[in-house]
Amino acid sequence: MAFEFPASFRFADSHEYANADGELVRVGISAFAVDQLGDIVFVDLPDVGDSLDKGATFGSVESVKAVEDMYAPVAGEVVQRNEAVLASPEELQNDPHGEGWLLVLRPSDPSQLEALMDAGTYGTKVNAG
């Protein structure tokens, strides 16, 4: 199965995405990661106001197969979290690049986005597998 990814998204090696929207960055996990996890049953996210370091664990996603940590693709302050995904983890599974987003961050260093893979590079990486 070949995966397609929104062109504006940037991706970490650990399959989290960052999508800049003005001064904020929306964070989630890729459709590839969701597919690998299988049926998602629980999502744990940080609280609004928490500060995240780039590469640091910011929560976990539990599926019938495994529990996986998620890592911040950029450093910043959590300004919003997706309560709908917390209440209904299947939202993440149904639309990981849309309604299944996880966090909105105010990045402390927006230039960190440039170090992430663009959608084409990430797509080549995961589709080659």
UniProtKB/Swiss-Prot annotation:
Keywords carried by this UniProt record: Lipoyl
Domain Lipoyl-binding: 24-106
One GO BP: glycine decarboxylation via glycine cleavage system
GO CC term, one of those recorded: glycine cleavage complex
Cofactor binding, note field: Binds 1 lipoyl cofactor covalently.
Signal sequence region: none
Needed cofactors: (R)-lipoate
Pfam families xref list: GCV_H
N6-lipoyllysine, modified sites: 65
Function of the protein: The glycine cleavage system catalyzes the degradation of glycine. The H protein shuttles the methylamine group of glycine from the P protein to the T protein.
Family note: Belongs to the GcvH family.
Subunit composition and interactions: The glycine cleavage system is composed of four proteins: P, T, L and H.
Protein name per its UniProtKB record: Glycine cleavage system H protein
Name of the encoding gene: gcvH
